[in-house]
Amino acid sequence: MDKSKRPFLKSKRSFRRRLPPIGSGDRIDYRNMSLISRFISEQGKILSRRVNRLTLKQQRLITIAIKQARILSSLPFLNNEKQFERTEFTARTTGSRTINLNK
């Protein structure tokens, strides 16, 4: 086979496998906040399995732990900073009457 008809061969690069984000000693539990917080986005959403690089079983356990932590109020449902920037008293006038929004 002459050189012009030979298929292009890529050089083999060394492939380093990434370490799993959850070690064998880590317990997936709703009380382990340092572990759970790694799998939540800035807005408080649960990250997908592809982003987390978890197995199906690990992702299911993480999802259950996050939901338990949210229900027990150790983790917020939403992580929205705009919610806390609101002023203490907001008055809105509509015609002749004033409506107090913070009741």
Curated annotation (Swiss-Prot):
* Lipid biosynthesis is among the record's keywords: no
Which family does the record claim for this protein?
Belongs to the bacterial ribosomal protein bS18 family.
Which subcellular locations apply to this protein? Answer: Plastid, Chloroplast
Query: To which species is this protein native?
Result: Buxus microphylla (Littleleaf boxwood)
A GO CC annotation given for this chain: chloroplast
Q: How does it assemble?
A: Part of the 30S ribosomal subunit.
Residue ranges crossing the lipid bilayer per the database entry: none
Name by which UniProt lists this protein? Small ribosomal subunit protein bS18c
